Each structure stands twice: as structure tokens, then as C-alpha cells.
Amino acid sequence: MASRPQNIGIKAIEIYFPSQYVEQSELEKFDGVSAGKYTIGLGQTKMSFCDDREDIYSFSLTVVSKLLKNYNVDTNSIGRLEVGTETILDKSKSVKSVLMQLFGDNTNIEGVDTVNACYGGTNAVFNTVNWIESSGWDGRDGIVVAGDIALYAKGNARPTGGAGAVALLIGPDAPIVIEPGLRGSYMQHAYDFYKPDLTSEYPYVDGHYSVNCYTKALDSAYRAYCKREAFLSKAATNGHTNGSAVESGLPKTPLDRFDYLAFHAPTCKLVAKSYARLLYHDYLADPESPAFADVPPEVRDMDYEKSLTDKVVEKTFMTLTKKRFQERVNPSIQVATMCGNMYCASVWGGLASLVSHVDPANLLGKRIGLFSYGSGLAASFCSFRVVGSTEQISKVLDIPNRLVASRRAVPPEAYDAMCDLRKKAHLQKDYKPEGEVSTILPGTYYLENIDDMFKRFYSVKA
């Protein structure tokens, strides 16, 4: 190859979420909990879901077909396709293999599926970037699909569900460039959330422990990122420049080097706490900074384990980040607020939300931090620079309009019934879905039937 690829990153983004949703305020009444428990306590407004007419195959077929169509992508220009999901329909056959029917005669496409809770999509992104940087690259682009259907058994966790998929076109000369060599990861063995029972779509989850794991992972991945950044800056080999930081009128701290951030969003309230947590790291690095004049003195020498759940730490830094959060993080949680947790698609839906809610002119030249977490556990912190126009991506995504138009509110009773319907349909063969095709939007793939050999057949809504 004559020259190595430059500005590797995201060239196009497509998103899909089901047309049906339940209002979290209605779910509060239905569940008999206090008003605001889900809407304020979790920071959630709506939750997307689907019945037995849709599954991870249909989600992925829909989002990839729309990516190819809406960006006029030649299927022969794709040399890698990788899927990140934890929604498993088959213990052997990959979702990627199902998607091959969209690529015609182009059978020379690398990649399969990546599985680790909500982290699979991020691993697929890293793999695809690594492929383009490697000697194995053949000059073509790659596609990453991240998607899931998040369902929980009845109880406290059920309102933290959601459903959706994101497809990313990755290649050189991209407008949204991943900063080369600059990421930090944290991997541990933990039983915070896991799915050992293959007869059920529902996970085993320890909610409080999982939040603790998420926070520790954020701390460690961010520290690893900062260490790597310092090394690369010293070596002057990474070629990135610091962001220009959205002006907030507040004293500057290292966190201000990110103009915007996107986080994996189990709940939007956790995202707000996580952004505040990053400022806590800045405080520990430089407690004498004028930015931290109002921080209580006892915070300085607090034991690390205690800091993970300490309300003084949480409240102090959430107060300090309130204004910056609205400017820098809120644009990235609009999808999560209105759709819920899309698992693997969550953080990439956050990036899509950000691109769709910030004017392309204001995004140009900016720096985006991104934190991805998957239970069990795997986590990474990385960053992007916007070096080209995101206008076409924003126009195609049209998320502000999509979140309102063509969506149908369903009462909690119907949502409950549809959860039971999915439970009934799980692992069935010789099965005809009962869900109404009328709820499916045009251009969306849906399940027609499953034969007596478990083979699944789909149609596209006209």
C-alpha cells in the first residue's frame, strides 16, 4: 500500500430504536412507587421496547440496511463487519453471518461477533480501527454494529431496560477521528450482572454492586487514559491537540480538555454522577486549585473505597459540574433519556445523540471523551476529535425528530403483557409471532416465523 491511512474514525452513523415505548411516569404509577422514582431518581423519561416481532437479527438488519442506503455505501467497499451484542439467539451462529445477506456477492468480509455485556460494540470499534491500522487492511472500510434488547424480570430493575441498535461506518479520512494510541482500559472478574440462564432473556443483577463496579471501572480506565496521554504528550507522537473547551466561565481543570463526553448509560442519573466523578479526580490531582475552593476539607484524605459511595463527595462534585454537565454531557444522553439502556448500543447511541444535538459548526474542531462499560467486567476510556463536517451525519440521524415522530406510547399494562409474550416466544421453534406488524415502521425488518429447525425468516415492512 502506497501510504498508511490517516484520520481513522467514524464516517457515518445510523441508529434504530423500536417505535413502541412506555412512559416512565406511567410505569411509576403502575408499579406503585413514588412519583419521580424513575423520572428523577433514574433520570429516565421513556423506555423503548419491542414484542416478539423483533429481535437482534431484525434490529441489526434494519440498522445496517439503513446505513448502506442513507449514506449510499457500496457494499463492495466494506471489508470488515463486526457485531457487539449480548442478546444471544444462537450459541454458534453469529449475528454477523445473518447480516451477510445484505452484501450480495461481496463474501470477502472479515469479522464476527464480540460478547461481553454492554462492552461488545466498543471492542468491535477497537478491533476495526486496529484492522485499518494493520498490515491486514485491504483499503476498504469497516462496519460496526452495536445493539441489544434490554429486559428485566419484574422488580426494581425493570424500568432500566431499553432497546436499540447503532451502526458505525469506520475508515480513514473520517470527520470523527479516534485519537490514535490514546485509550485506557480496566478489566476484572466480577458477578455484578450476568446471564448464565440461557432459557431466559433476563439477567442476574446486583444493582448496587454493579454501580460500584461501574464507578471503579470509570476511575481506573480514566486514570489509565490520563497516564497514556501524559506518556504520548511527553513523547510527542500522538499528534492530537487539546480541545478548545466549551466556555463555561468556570475555573479550568483537566476535565475541560474534553469539549463533550459520552458515557455508557445504564441510567442517565449515573451518567451525571460519573461526569462529577471525573472532576473528583481533577481535585485529587490538584486540591489547591481555585476551582475547588468550596470542596469540604474532609474529602481530601478520604479512603478510596469510602469515596465510591460517599454522599458528600457525590453531592459536592455534582454541584460543581452542574453547569458544565448541561453544556457538555446532556446532548449525549437524549437518546438514553427517551429510549432507556440499549446495552451495547448505549454509549454509541450517546455519540449519535451528541452529533445530532450539537450544531455541526460548533462541533468542528472539538474533542469528545467516551467511556464504555460492560459488566463482568470490561471498560475503556477513549477520545475523538471532530476534524470534518458532521452535517450529513446529523441530517441522516435526525434524532430530535425521530424521538418524537413515529413513536407510539403503550400503557404499562401492555408493556407488561409484551414482556410476557417475549418470555413465551424465547427459544421456541415452529413459531409464528403474535405481535402486531402494524406497529413496525416502514423499512424495518421483522420476524415472520421460526420453522421446526429453529431457522428464522424475516420481511421488510413496506
Pin down the residues of each PLM region.
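Condensing-enzyme catalytic core mediating Claisen C-C bond formation in acyl metabolism
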Residues: M1-R53, A157-E247, L377, F381-A462
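Cysteine-centered functional microenvironments
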Residues: I109-N123, G155-R158, Y202-S210, R257-L261, ...
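Acidic, glycine-rich active-site loops and adjacent beta-strand->loop/helix elements
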Residues: E14-Y16, V83-D90, N116-G121, V145-L151, ...
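Conserved catalytic cysteine-centered active-site region
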Residues: K37-G41, T45-S58, E86-D141, H281-S346
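A conserved active-site cap/scaffold subdomain adjacent to cofactor or substrate pockets
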Residues: V211-G243, P251-F258, A262-P290, P297-E298
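Conserved beta-ketoacyl condensing-enzyme motif
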Residues: I10, D55-T122, S244-E247, K252-R277, ...
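C-terminal catalytic subdomain
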Residues: M302-K311, Q326-R408
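Flexible, glycine-rich active-site loops centered on histidine and acidic residues
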Residues: E133-L168
